[in-house]
């Protein structure tokens, strides 16, 4: 009887040990799985709009961004363009494919390639930049470009959003382009090339996924870039009334 009791006790303790080991292994596996980087994706069309200028120019404009990856590494496709509805031609068409990694709590570094394919000469650029949230809640995107022709330039985009109510948001934008060398073939002069400023009032209609807006945009060219535009019969400064929508997937 004593022997039987001993065997039962040993079997019971062994079963507890096996159960505990299995449970511990499951906990380790679950913890390891939870530590794996979470892969996410998304599409944001920041600007999808119709513009009408003070000299009767009509444009269809978009600024879209799609991403796939983790917090440690994202792959981004960025597309921007302006299409003249009267001329039925692209005034600008830009696509970027970049990889992005965090370098601080508020900023990411990115590198990749940019393709410009408007109606005129095409250009390919190497891209190096940073993007993130600056003090006072300014969203900043700064990039350095080196073209396949050897020209270098830099671009700064900044945006500030003022929450008027839970649904009404006023957005102010600024973008500026500086060229460190001339590219006459595409109308780019050395120095400050152009600036664009915008003010848009939007309403978050559908759970912040669809937000129609109205606004005004001002664009201006400077220096040799303005001279090149005038020589081609184009303008150097425009004011646009804007209507469009911000769409997020």
Can you annotate each of these PLM segments?
Residues 122-183:
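Detector for outer-membrane/organellar transmembrane beta-barrel domains
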Residues 71-77, 105-109, 136-140, 165-170, ...:
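Repeated loop/turn-to-beta-strand initiation elements of outer-membrane beta-barrel proteins
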Residues 56-57, 88-93, 122-127, 154-157, ...:
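Outer-membrane beta-barrel translocator domains and adjoining extracellular loop/strand segments
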Residues 199-205, 235-249:
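Outer-membrane beta-barrel "beta-signal"
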Residues 45-47, 77-81, 111-115, 142-146, ...:
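Transmembrane beta-barrel strands of outer-membrane/channel proteins
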Residues 39, 58-62, 91-95, 122-126, ...:
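Residues that define the transmembrane beta-barrel architecture of outer-membrane proteins
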Residues 68-70, 99-101, 115, 132, ...:
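Residue-level signature of outer-membrane beta-barrel architecture
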Residues 22-86, 100-101:
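Outer-membrane beta-barrel initiation region
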């Amino acid at each position: 009887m004593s022997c039987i009791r001993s065997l039962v006790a040993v079997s019971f303790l062994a079963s507890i040990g096996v159960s505990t080991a299995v449970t511990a292994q499951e906990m380790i596996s679950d913890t390891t799985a939870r530590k794996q980087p979470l892969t996410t994706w998304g599409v944001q069309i920041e600007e999808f709009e119709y513009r009408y200028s003070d000299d009767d120019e009509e444009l269809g404009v978009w600024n879209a961004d799609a991403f796939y990856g983790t917090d440690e590494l994202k792959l981004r496709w960025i597309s921007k363009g302006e299409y003249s509805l009267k001329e039925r031609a692209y005034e600008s068409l830009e696509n970027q494919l970049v990889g992005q990694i965090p370098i601080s709590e508020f900023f990411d570094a990115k590198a990749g390639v940019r393709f410009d394919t408007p109606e005129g000469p095409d250009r390919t650029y190497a891209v190096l930049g940073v993007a993130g949230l600056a003090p006072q809640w300014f969203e900043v995107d700064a990039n350095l470009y080196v073209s396949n022709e050897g020209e270098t330039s830099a671009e700064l985009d900044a945006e500030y959003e003022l929450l008027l109510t839970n649904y009404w948001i006023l957005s102010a934008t600024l973008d500026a382009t500086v060229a460190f060398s001339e590219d006459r073939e595409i109308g780019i002069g050395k120095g400050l090339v152009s600036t664009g400023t915008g003010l848009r009032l939007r309403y978050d209609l559908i759970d912040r996924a669809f937000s129609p807006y109205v606004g005004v945009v001002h664009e201006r060219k400077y220096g040799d870039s303005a001279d090149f535009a005038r020589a081609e019969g184009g303008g150097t400064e425009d004011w646009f009334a804007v209507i469009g929508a911000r769409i997020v997937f």
